[in-house]
A protein has these predicted regions:
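Protein kinase-like catalytic core scaffold
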Residues: 35, 70, 84, 140-143
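Amphipathic alpha-helical segments that line or abut small-molecule/effector binding pockets
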Residues: 104-120
Length: 177
């Protein structure tokens, strides 16, 4: 894959950044500027039901923005081709930092504040550490997924299990490699 279009504008694809439950995210470039281009996929996910994924992404983006969660800007959405163009947040993920034995302690206060903002807005975000990038000392939630708040999926009850080298984190890495 060399290029993808978003609303008839062509973007060069540099590399695959990652695959999530809802799509593939690519590092893309146009006119010397880098972006994230997300292509929605329709592969089955045993533990999650999406409905219309592109509409859900747009809806969730607005909910996160209104709540005050630090997220990359959605620059364009192409409903027909199920593609989203996002601001590229350049930096390491919390996941990669943990995997490489870099302390994430400096970011714990920020994630706890973000979790409190989400809770006050009645939302849970996906606290898995691949969804957070550090840029200039700030953490960004780079996914747009959010759900109605449920205590069992809060940062304190679920997310924290993956923000250090806990048995859950180590088990995830061993299954992934």
């Amino acid at each position: 894959m060399k290029a993808l279009t978003v609303n008839e504008k062509e973007y060069s694809i540099i590399k695959l950044l990652g695959k999530g439950k809802g799509g593939y995210s690519y590092l893309a470039e146009k006119d010397g500027k880098q972006y994230v281009l997300k292509q929605i996929h329709h592969e089955p996910c045993a533990y999650y039901n999406f409905g219309n994924k592109i509409e859900a992404e747009n809806h969730d983006y607005k909910r996160l923005l209104n709540a005050g969660i630090r997220i990359p800007e959605m620059i364009e959405i192409d409903i027909e081709n199920e593609r989203i163009l996002k601001e590229y947040i350049d930096g390491d993920t919390i996941f990669d930092m943990l995997k490489n034995d870099v302390s994430v302690e400096p970011y714990m206060e920020q994630i706890c504040e973000m979790a409190e903002i989400a809770k006050k807005a009645g939302l849970n975000i996906d606290y898995f550490p691949t969804n957070f990038v550090v840029q200039n000392g700030l953490i960004y939630y780079i996914d747009y997924e959010c759900n109605e708040y449920m205590e069992e999926w809060s940062f304190e009850n679920w997310g924290i299990k993956y923000w250090s080298k806990t048995p859950e984190f180590i088990e995830y890495i061993s299954k992934k490699d």
